[in-house]
Amino acid sequence: MKKTQTWIITCIYLQLLLFNPLVHTQGICRNRVTDDVKDVTKLVANLPKDYMITLKYVPGMDVLPSHCWISEMVEQLSVSLTDLLDKFSNISEGLSNYSIIDKLVKIVDDLVECMEEHSFENVKKSSKSPEPRQFTPEKFFGIFNKSIDAFKDLEIVASTMSECVISSTSSPEKDSRVSVTKPFMLPPVAASSLRNDSSSSNRKASNSIEDSSLQWAAVALPAFFSLVIGFAFGALYWKKKQPNLTRTVENRQINEEDNEISMLQEK
């Protein structure tokens, strides 16, 4: 009985070992993103809305898959956040903003390191270079949040040739620069809209639905077959051991009857 229980436990652990690698193929850099990204809302509310932040924007971010631009975009975000950090002195009145930006810099630097470890192959990059632009805090951290969200589902999926080239027939990108006239302070509630750029999110949603269905199919099917195979082995083992267990019980009953007979004879 103990051997049967041991085999069942072994089968369960085997399924876990087979299933976990399949699950962890999704979001290759996901564990580098900490809860400190939630402080972006607070930071945007603290900065004047007319404050301009320089960022080299990667062309095609709104129309191409994330693996086409995420590596270069996160490097440019690291440069811009580091420059922004240098503009805040590490003193009491500026400590809140300084601390938040410092944590964001560490997150982005970790993501840069992760992307260096997981380089995309067979990807034909666009010949266009990042364009220096001026963004308000809301626009800048909207790009930051979009990049962070891209890491949650980022995979090494470029097994075939993937051209990351902007079509010449596609409409020109909307200029993200914002006029400095008539500045006003950004209420904290408005910062929650950073993640919701309607035009880009709709395109992202349509692409992500198709990608996620394929990803889950790739994960679920091998896991299902591994579970079936594991339980089949367990059933065969149990069936093989069942006659031995039956014979053991019968032998035990015979021995008990023999002992009772011998005790009666002795009396």
UniProtKB/Swiss-Prot annotation:
Q: Name one GO cellular component term.
A: extracellular region
Spell out the Pfam families in the cross-references: SCF
Can you tell me which residues are glycosylated?
90, 97, 145, 196
A GO BP term here is: positive regulation of cell population proliferation
Identify the Gene3D superfamilies for this entry.
1.20.1250.10
Q: Which UniProt keywords apply?
A: Cell adhesion, Cell membrane, Cell projection, Cytoplasm, Cytoskeleton, Disulfide bond, Glycoprotein, Growth factor, Membrane, Pyrrolidone carboxylic acid, Secreted, Signal, Transmembrane, Transmembrane helix
Residues annotated as signal peptide: 1-25
Tell me the residue ranges located in the Extracellular compartment per UniProt. 26-215
Disulfide cysteine pairs (residue numbers): 29-114, 68-164
Mind telling me how this protein is modified after translation? A soluble form is produced by proteolytic processing of the extracellular domain.
Under InterPro entries, the record lists: 4_helix_cytokine-like_core, SCF
Family classification = Belongs to the SCF family.
**What is this protein for, i.e. what is its function?**
Ligand for the receptor-type protein-tyrosine kinase KIT. Plays an essential role in the regulation of cell survival and proliferation, hematopoiesis, stem cell maintenance, gametogenesis, mast cell development, migration and function, and in melanogenesis. KITLG/SCF binding can activate several signaling pathways. Promotes phosphorylation of PIK3R1, the regulatory subunit of phosphatidylinositol 3-kinase, and subsequent activation of the kinase AKT1. KITLG/SCF and KIT also transmit signals via GRB2 and activation of RAS, RAF1 and the MAP kinases MAPK1/ERK2 and/or MAPK3/ERK1.
Q: How is this protein named in the record?
A: Kit ligand
Give the organism the record lists: Ovis aries (Sheep)
Q: What is the lineage of its organism?
A: Eukaryota, Metazoa, Chordata, Craniata, Vertebrata
